[in-house]
């Protein structure tokens, strides 16, 4: 099953085939034709789960959507899922923690948004504490993860920052085990996964100037 969706989460088309890759050209060209017929501009970027880049320099996705000149990027969720191959099991007690830290290696919070949220929470604190100023620790404790996701944007870190942080994360988890002694990471497999995936760090970069968030009330 291959699906194509838009920025609003709507599925524009899908194809179910008996073999991987079959029918994709007709699927993609159908979308190109529909955009052209209604006078809609081609998308600035296409996010994919594979084939984001090529040794020849031209992604197969670019060829499928010809003549569009949209940038092609690798979806971060699918990038992170590739690291599961280097773990002993997804049922390991430390699996969730590893995934959360891996996400933090890829994304950073917009500091202007974070500062705006902190100022709003500071005002709430002072209103409910007779005007007293909260400490930084108290202020941060009032911000829930849900509030931060709702009010603050994230963006991808630079290639070298991602490389450095993921390398540091892997170094920190090599020897971690659960209470039975089961390791979180399979050393040999994870070494190979990381070696291969480093070439895709450029594919995770947000296109310059592209607005990836929709403002809601």
Set out the residue ranges of the language-model regions:
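Intrinsic-disorder/low-complexity, polar/charged segments
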Residues: 20-24, 56-57, 94, 154, ...
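Short, charged/polar low-complexity linear motifs in solvent-exposed/disordered segments
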Residues: 29-31, 90, 100-102, 159-162
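Short, flexible coil/linker segments at or flanking structured domains
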Residues: 34, 65-67, 189-192
